[in-house]
Amino acid sequence: MKDVKLVIIGCLLFFIGHLLSWFQNNSQFVWDWWKERPLFTVLLFSVPTSLTFWYGMRYAYHGMGDKLWSARFLGFAASYVTFPLLTYLFLGENLFKTKTLLCIALSFCIVGIQIFWK
């Protein structure tokens, strides 16, 4: 049995986690200030990022009927939505390439299969 409310909360937490993770890893390429501050970056981002993934997995796991693989695929698909958008917005890398768009579409398919397939 699936609890849609828990799945939505889990997905939102996965999106936030991937957003934080993107900034933790890629701020060095966007802003010069971050280039020489790896330890500060890790200390600043690691705890909130880890907590959002931890709670995201918890909510998604229970929301997907205690299925770990289903929760894992939701987290994976969330990364393929956040990464291309943030990379386009902050680094100007083209989001509208066939390969990237297909990966994003496949991510939505994965989420749909996990949520709606009985």
Regions found by a protein language model. Name each.
Residues 1-118:
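Polytopic alpha-helical membrane proteins, predominantly small-molecule transporters/carriers
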